[in-house]
Regions:
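Substrate-binding clefts and catalytic carboxylate motifs of secreted carbohydrate-active enzymes
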Residues: 70-72, 107-110, 144-280, 284-288, ...
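Active-site mouth of glycoside hydrolases
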Residues: 1-130, 218
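Acidic/polar loop patches that form or flank catalytic/metal-binding clefts of enzymes
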Residues: 11, 115-122, 216-217, 257-261, ...
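Flexible loop/turn segments at secondary-structure boundaries
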Residues: 17-20, 41-42, 78-82, 126-128, ...
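Intrinsically disordered, low-complexity Pro/Gly/Ser/Thr-rich segments with frequent PxxP/GP/PP motifs
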Residues: 289-324
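Buried hydrophobic-core signal for structured, non-transmembrane domains
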Residues: 53, 57, 266-272, 314, ...
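Terminal connector regions
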Residues: 274, 315-367
Length: 371
């Protein structure tokens, strides 16, 4: 399911999985970024550092035989509970990164496995030994902005983004305590699911349209719900898909065609993530208004190279929010459809759903749905 959803890598987050998981990733060619068990905040004394380094090096020894594993992550969001970054202070300024266990842990892992890159502190964007980003704009930070606020921003490599949408009512009823707790928002489950779709689609396409400029990759959090009361997956705990899966299937395939927009249409891009060129292809777009009248359209031939990002069209800003527009995009070759994408009422960009909580509990690691 992971590979069929267009992903070629994943992140094992703050745990060690079953041996068969790593064997399957080897066979399927799915790359793995692998965390330690360090999450948010732990003691900074030397005794803890020595014990933790010993534990993580055992993990490295156990897993480094797997060719799918391409990166170690020493700590996840260090200082998350003790440091609020400001323009003058970075997450990397926390004690975990500067004092303990970060410096010794990073050095030990680099020495223990010099064949792979090592991230010292995931989410320490400006740290030269880290650099990856986490972005929950419009999600965990839903009360403070909109997911489209990412427009115009760049990230070198994103290793966390996503949105938590509860599963369908029938599945929630399988866990009565969870079902009872969510009573106040049951009528909003469909709109919350739709919001997951819109947010994921916008984020994925945002990253893909900055391929190597500067973005080198992204990791959606999570693929499946790890327990009945956490909802970040695009599959629920019982294995049923949510609306977010549709966004992944539309926007996450190796060959894609995408529209850059916010308040107006900006440009159309083609992306080829394969290591071979597609050659000469026919690309096209059609923009219609709410009556179905064609407002703009074009078709042309273009050569699409291997592992590439290609700008296909620029727009002049005359098509903007305030009216309903539907957009269809496609890539064809010799009569075969290679990729397509659609945006129904393209400027409809829903707000964070009322009733969906904005409070995140760092004790439980999930949102608090008040009874």
């Amino acid at each position: 399911q992971i590979k069929n959803s267009g992903f070629n890598m994943l992140r094992v987050h703050v745990h060690v999985d079953l041996p068969v998981f790593y064997e399957l990733c080897d066979e399927l060619g799915l790359g793995i970024m692998h965390d330690s068990e360090y999450n948010w905040m732990h003691p900074v004394d030397e005794a803890f550092a020595d014990r933790f380094i010993h534990i993580y090096l055992e993990t490295v020894d156990m897993l480094k035989k797997h060719p799918s594993l391409f990166c170690w992550i020493c700590m996840n969001e260090p200082g998350n509970l003790t440091l609020n970054p400001t323009p003058d202070m970075d997450r990397a300024d926390c004690d975990a990164m500067k004092v303990s266990p970060g410096p010794k842990l990073f050095a030990a892992v680099c020495e223990h496995d010099p064949s792979r890159p090592v991230i010292k502190g995931s989410f320490c964007v400006n740290d030269p030994d880290s650099g990856d980003s986490h972005n929950y704009t419009g999600s965990l930070d839903g009360a403070d902005g909109h997911y489209s606020d990412i427009y115009g921003t760049t990230e070198k490599m994103n290793t966390e983004f996503g949105f938590d949408a509860p599963p369908c009512i029938d599945d929630l009823k399988k866990m009565p305590p969870v079902y009872r707790r969510l009573q106040p928002i049951l009528e909003n489950l469909d709109s919350i699911g739709q919001y997951q779709y819109y947010l994921l689609k916008y984020f994925i396409e945002h990253y893909r349209m900055q391929k190597y400029k500067p973005n080198a990759g992204y990791v959606q959090f999570l693929f499946n719900d790890m327990c009945p009361q956490t909802f970040y997956g695009i599959y629920d705990y019982w294995g049923l898909p949510k609306k977010g899966l549709q966004a992944v299937l539309e926007s996450n395939m190796p060959i894609g065609i995408f529209l850059k927009f916010k308040d107006k249409l900006d440009a159309i891009y083609a992306v080829n993530d394969y290591s071979y060129p597609l050659g000469t292809c026919q690309v096209g777009y059609s923009i219609t208004d709410e009556t179905g009248k064609v407002v703009a359209e074009d078709v042309k031939s273009i050569v699409i190279a291997e592992d590439s990002l290609t700008k296909l069209w620029d727009f002049d800003g005359t098509i903007h929010s305030g009216n309903v527009y539907n957009v269809a995009l496609w890539i064809e070759q010799d009569g075969k459809l290679l990729a397509r994408n659609e945006y129904h009422d393209v400027f409809y960009m829903p707000e964070h759903t009322p009733g969906h909580p904005v409070h995140m509990s760092h004790e439980t690691g999930c949102r608090i749905y008040w009874a």
